């Protein structure tokens, strides 16, 4: 996806960034795991603010960052509270991650999507379904129990045009 396409999908504003640049790697939230071509999403947590690691992510090869504030000299897609509803303002980059995942699914309409929900047994069921999905073709499923508002979009963003089956796990 190009930066312009991503900006439209997440209602973001390009800063220090060419709109034609493409993400050729993954969407990453841990700056220590950034590789060349990745897109880094700066998430503010209770103890650590991902915005502190944006410059390091670029230095490691990220093509840009999704951030909620401008970081001088860092190619960024800025999502601000002004672009969000009142329920979304607390974590604009988390919301942007979800919007980007939703957008990707619209670009890949032929993927079989299986969602596992409930209060117990989800991970085992998800693992069994992932094994079955592999019989159909390339399958994306979360490793472990990444079933929250960050893990679910990250799983979706692992998909590409070769993916046949997407297994998702969500706790209610």
Model-predicted regions and their roles:
Residues 1-99:
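N-terminal leader/targeting and accessory segments in enzymes
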Residues 89, 93-172:
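Phosphate-binding loop of NTP-binding sites
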């Amino acid at each position: 996806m190009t930066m312009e396409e991503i900006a439209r999908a997440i209602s973001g504003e390009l800063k220090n960034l060419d709109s034609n640049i493409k993400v050729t790697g993954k969407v990453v939230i841990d700056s220590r795991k950034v590789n060349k071509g990745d897109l880094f999403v700066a998430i503010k947590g209770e103890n650590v603010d991902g915005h502190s690691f944006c410059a390091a992510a670029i230095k490691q090869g990220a093509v840009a960052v999704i951030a909620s504030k401008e970081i001088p000299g860092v190619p960024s897609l800025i999502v601000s509270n002004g672009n969000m509803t009142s329920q979304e303002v607390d974590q604009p980059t988390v919301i942007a991650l979800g919007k980007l995942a939703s957008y990707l699914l619209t670009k890949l309409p032929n993927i079989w999507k299986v969602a596992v929900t409930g209060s117990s047994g989800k991970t085992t069921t998800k693992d069994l379904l992932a094994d079955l999905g592999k019989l159909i073709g390339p399958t994306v499923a979360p490793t472990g129990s990444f079933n929250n508002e960050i893990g679910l979009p990250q799983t979706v963003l692992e998909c590409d045009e070769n993916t046949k089956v997407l297994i998702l796990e969500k706790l209610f």
